[in-house]
Amino acid sequence: MTKKTIQASCRKNKLYLTPHLNDVLYLHYSGYNAIDGLDEYVGLKCLWLECNAISNISGLDHQSQLRCLYLHNNLIKKIENLQHCKQLDTLNLSHNHIAKIENCGSDILPVLNTLNISHNYLKSIESLAELRKCDFVSVLDISHNRIEDIAIVKVLADMKGLRVLTLVGNPVVNDIPSYRKTLILECKSLTYLDSRPVFDKDRACAEAWKRGGYEEERKEHQRWKKEEQRKMRRSINATLRLRHRGDGEPELLKTSSDEEEEEKEGSAAGRGDFEELEYQSNDVAWKEMEALFNQHTKGDTQQAQKLAEERKASTNSVDYITGSDSNSDPTLVTDCDSCVRNSSRACSSRSDTSDSEDMFDKIVPKKHRKLASSMRPEVSLSDSSSSSSETEDEAGSILDSKLDRQNTITEFIDEYKRFFHSVDLRDPKCVLKNRHKIVRPQTAKSQRTEPIVYEGVLKAMEQNSNGAKIEQARQERFEANERSLAKEAVLERLMKGHAEVDMNIEQQMISIGGKQHNFNEYRLEVFRQDQEKLQNLIDRVTAQKEKYNAHIDSIHDQLANIMEDYGQISEKLRKVDDMIQNIGDEVVVHQEKERDGLEVIQELEPITIAEQIVENMTKEQVPDEVEANDKASDATIDPVDQLSSDESAIDLGELNQHVDAQVEVGPSDPKDATTSKPIPEEFGSDPVYRKFIDIQYEIDKLTEDQIFTALSEAARELQEEELETKLVHDAIDEYWSTDLEDFRRNLNLDAHPIVQRFKRFIECQGTDTDDTDSEAHVRRLENAYHRYERRLSNHLFDEYLMLSRKASIATTTGGESSATELELVELDGGHVLRASTSRRATAWDLKETVEDPVEELEELNEEEDPALKEAGDFKHDELEDEESKPEEKTLKSAEVLGMQEPLADVQGDH
């Protein structure tokens, strides 16, 4: 890193060429091994040095304003030389070789906020003790290190400002019980752990787990879940209220069952008092109705005034219950209310029955609290005062007004229906929740009427109006909700999910390719097909695995054989090295003796030395030649002995070269024990030892380069031989897996010509047989069977040898295959009754010729009739051919050759 390279980097990244004007510098991916040349860059705030070969931190003495330093993917082993960077906020040292955190406490880096030391070599608690001094570090990444000590939890707990922690990839993560809960409890300010944030719910559940275990944690989780659902519901209801502002109260979301239970428990006492008071007020209203319909037709003014006062008192009690007094808020009047009022004006009369109570409260009895007089609009003080004066004037004409209006009840029933269009009858709490907003339609005091007085009206109204009309109103309200598609219904369906959808698709018929199929049958059929495909794949993989394992085993066996051969070769080479070392020591001793006794050596003539060496060697070789001649005369000559006898016959030219080499080196003193070491008897008669002596003389004449070249060529030849051996073994393996299997599969003994001929022979012999000569016939068949069996085995063996010609190389090179592994086609021997107790010929019994019959068969043949014997022999001779005696000729030829070779050797010696 030089000033020139730094300026080139600035030019490349379009930075300032004036050093102190740059606040950021990009020196990453540059191959630097040290930090240098930054003295003039005093205004740097961000320095990028990642992906280099920096081994230590240095050269930052003038970077007092540095805020961010990126040194990841380097070769740093120690944190040092950062005391001048007092304003450093972010330090990235990941993917380095740091084994200990040091020199980064608050005394050196007082404002350090983010520290990344992931993918390093931190292991013990001592290497992390410096973190206790990092008071202002809020983001710490120590992932993918080698931390194993569980005490790291206490170190992290001492970091009061820690907010974000990444600890994944360390062995200690698996050792900490309840890893996430433990760290949340220990690190009080933690907001992000590994790859997930830490919410208040997680911390509350962790604290509950600490208090009472998993059961307490489950309860805390349920409590948080309910609270979240409650907040969501409140938010949706608030949104619905804002949307329907001015249109009346919207249909809001219902609370869950558990919240309803809590609300019921909380409001049980108040609701009981309300029902009691409401019942009392309704009881007073019914008594009032009875008195009204049972009064005399003339109408008494005083009694009417008394009844009006009683009704006023009951009305005031009801207003007290419903909160509709003069001090309450003004009620909202909807469009439906205006419509009802207009209709009520059309059917109004000249007088009214009371000042603060309409006919709806008297006509409809108490069956639902929505039908009671609790939904009464407030009445101002001026209205109440004026109504009291009007009651006195109109009390006398009550009966006349009732008789004039015959259709008043029907009109009020219609008004009752229109009223229920604006009330949600499905919500039993509608009266309590909406008592200040949803109001029953009113009629003006001057337009109110009294019901017609006739017998049985109360009974008829109770039977007809109470149940049927309420049910009809509910049905109309339900149909209206379905037509309007209210927001509450849509949200309710979204909250409940697909409760009304028929999900039983297994019983439905589906159409595939234009045909109807049962879902269960189609699914089972597809499952069977997938299972068959999977099973076929498993079988293929298993077969491939078995084949691969067999191939690996064969390779291991071949390697074992090769290593065994190499061991034998190395042992022989070690012996050769020992012999060469002994010969070298003798040569050194010869040179020393040559310097000491130079005069004595000069007196000896070279011809004399050569003659002595030749004489000694000829003496040693005479017994070997005689022994070789004796072995050559034998018919069964051992190949190893022939090789020794051939090698013992040393060429005359090689002998002269050996003599010349002895002359150059000089003779050794036979009396000196150090110069002439006794040769072991096993090497004295070994021609290989003599050959190695000659090779040693040739090696001494070569230079080092020539020796190296020769060894290289030998190594290359060994590699080529090894490669050829491998190819041969591969070909053999292929043969065993293909050709031999084809041979066995295609082998059909019934169709073999020899077997066909044997069957025809049996048919011929079976046509002219009598009971008298049955034993002779059995013997003839037995003899023919032996001959045909031997002939068939010879044929099959010849075919097998033709197929196994590839494997002959492996048997000679010491490979995997051998003669014992050749699974020859063999006809197992058996025993037959009576004369067939002799062992039958097989493919391995080739040495057994036709001329060596079984003794029992010979005895039986001698007892036969001469005429039958001649006839049988004639038939056997017809069937006999040259193929039944293949080894007889080979043995005779081998004996002839064995007799000729010793004669040739003796003549050559002479």
Curated annotation (Swiss-Prot):
Any one GO MF annotation of this record: dynein complex binding
Keywords annotated in UniProt: Cell projection, Cilium, Leucine-rich repeat, Repeat
GO cellular component, one term: axoneme
Function according to Swiss-Prot or TrEMBL: Cilium-specific protein required for cilia structures.
LRR repeat start-end pairs: 43-64, 65-86, 87-108, 111-132, 136-157
Protein name: Dynein axonemal assembly factor 1 homolog
Biased composition (Low complexity): 380-389
Residue ranges occupied by any LRRCT domain in the UniProt entry: 171-209
Gene3D superfamilies, sorted: Ribonuclease Inhibitor
Record SMART domains: LRR_SD22 (SM00365)
Organism: Anopheles gambiae
Regions of compositional bias (Acidic residues) in chain numbering: 855-865
Primary location recorded for the protein, binned into one broad class: other
Family designation: Belongs to the DNAAF1 family.
